[in-house]
Amino acid sequence: MSGSGSEQTPRLTRSSSRSTLTGVASGRVEKIRSSPKSLDRIAKKYKDFDPETAKIIRADLEETQADKTMEVGGSTQESAQQITGAKRPNEEDQGGAQEAAKRVNRSNKVNSLLTSNGVTDPAKSKISNYIVGRLNANNIEADSVMVAECTNIAIHAWKEGKKYLDDKIISQATTTIPTLITNLVSNANTLSNVIASLNNVPDKLVSDIRTQVENVSNQTGQKAAKRDVLLKSSESIYNNAVKESKVDFINNYLTSSGVNVDELRKDSHHYRTVVSRIEKKYTVLVMMPEHEEHHTLKEKVATNRTFVKESAQTLSQKYVTQ
């Protein structure tokens, strides 16, 4: 944001029903109210998630409708909604085809990085959708806030995902966080470097990383409103990524236990019933503490396969493979 005179930093204040962005650039105040959302429509859109996840998504979509409007260069810039390359609202007169092509390119780049880092079929991944959505939200190709946000996304999503989906134990090597983040923020083309550095970032430093992202964003001139959106986004992305990785782990676990997951998921009630039975009898599918390494998790699940198969078989024979 540019301005003359004694420019002050906008503030984002939040209440239970609305968010208000106040700024003094250009001598005016922007007041933004969140738009009502159809919870049924949102719930249907994310039908693959369990109720706990649906609550997270609904809360994020409801509360951030106002938050996702940021003042950039003296004008408000509305965020994109879902990410597919489709036109944004009121885009027809603003080079819609060109912007849609850019969004497709962003999506392809993110999915390529996901594939190279072991995420199967990333185009169907909620993690992929969330990352591309946040990039599209500002429609900016190279912006330090977006790079910092991608850092949070990568650290949170892939680190948590690797706990469940990767045989490789995450390295606990130390990393100089301020240097890492400073380099990432100063270079807007380092998403691949973020991905490459993940195995060197211990879980316990995630909160330090988030703090450093905020500090560096502030030091490089980013405004408080954008910083608030960045941090809020990283938290919601974290929650969704953790849940997505857990869903993937559960499905892989069910398959390896002789359960026909595709058939089971056709009945969402039966699917939740089986998962609930497993979680009540064993804590193995509950989020593991940070000190629990992946090989320990695999040892625990190895003894539970018969119970898993029988849990599905009692509902219907068609849910088990021969």
From Swiss-Prot:
It comes from the Viruses. It is found in: Virion; Host cytoplasm. Residues 1-46, 60-117 are annotated as: Disordered. One of its GO terms (cellular component) is host cell cytoplasm. Residues 1-10, 74-84, 107-117 have a biased composition (Polar residues). Residues 11-22 have a biased composition (Low complexity). Residues 28-46, 60-70 have a biased composition (Basic and acidic residues). This is Phosphoprotein. The gene is P.
